[in-house]
Amino acid sequence: MTTREEALAFGLSYPDTCQDAPFHDTNWQLVRIKSSKKVFLWTYEKDGYINLNVKADPEWRDYWRSAFVSVTAGYHLNKEHWSTIILDGTVPDDAIKNMIDESYRMVTDSPTKRIYEAVKKIPKGKDRKSVV
């Protein structure tokens, strides 16, 4: 993956996603979840390279940053939760896709949503007796 178009296309391949340019600056393009408006992939050009910002679990964040020189603390974002991937050809496509996938999963997974879905599955029987 070496172009913004490839990164955006991969991000847009996930369900319920859309592309946006929030700063009225075509250099900053992002992919967000339509329903929640949460962003999981930022793209921009800096120093002659396309950069991607992705959300990362702290354990994986440290792994990715130590494994690749071109994965750094998130530019213009919370350094603890976001990483920047510089598309200079040194990070393999599968690693980039894994990081984008992790970012998507982090913004779509919510404990509240999991609890709500679990509660909806609890059977509602006709023989339920009220407790007095």
Mark where each language-model region is.
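Charge-dense, helix-prone N-terminal extensions
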Residues: 1-132
